[in-house]
Amino acid sequence: FEVSENLYADLAYLETLWNYAFKMSGDQDWLFGAYSLADVFFAPVAARIACYKLPVSQQAQQYVDKHLAHQDFRQWRAMGLTKHYDPFPYNMPCASVPWPGPRTIAAAVAQGPSENETCPYSGDAVTDFLRIDGRVFGFCNPFCRDKTLVDPAAWPEFMALYSTAKA
């Protein structure tokens, strides 16, 4: 889509804010040095910049990329994608790109039985299943399954199970 003058102005102002914060923190990875609520606040903005390939400076793009790779961001996104909306709120009539964040492991909803008897998150008995690389894993509810379906590598508890040899 064509970036409007107003959007260019908003992006320039955003970069002015970010650059000031980086300067104050000594040009660390996050706005004020360590990851903070300021970074959490700008996470959805970073996602929009990435999805619509909005024109930003190299430093701003590095900050956006840092968000996309951050475990908390990946988990937040995965949990959000477990809910489907019809109609989709705030749908914009412009082209976007496939998710530019880290590539995920291909997964699909499956039937049991599973390699594991308890959910990697809660420790509860499994009732819902997911297939990855020909292996079936169990979860205690559809939400635990679906957040893992979206981005398995965002979840250390699951990856610990996934990295073990098949039982």
Q: Where in this protein do the model-derived segments appear?
A:
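Acidic/histidine-enriched, glycine/proline-rich intrinsically disordered or flexible terminal extensions
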Residues: L81-V109
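GST-like fold's C-terminal all-alpha helical module
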Residues: F1-R74, M79, A106, A110-S114
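Residues immediately within or flanking Cys/His clusters that coordinate Zn2+
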Residues: N116, T127, G134-F137
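Cys/His/Pro-rich metal-binding microdomains
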Residues: P120, G138, P142
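Short metal-binding segments enriched for Cys and/or His
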Residues: R145-Y162
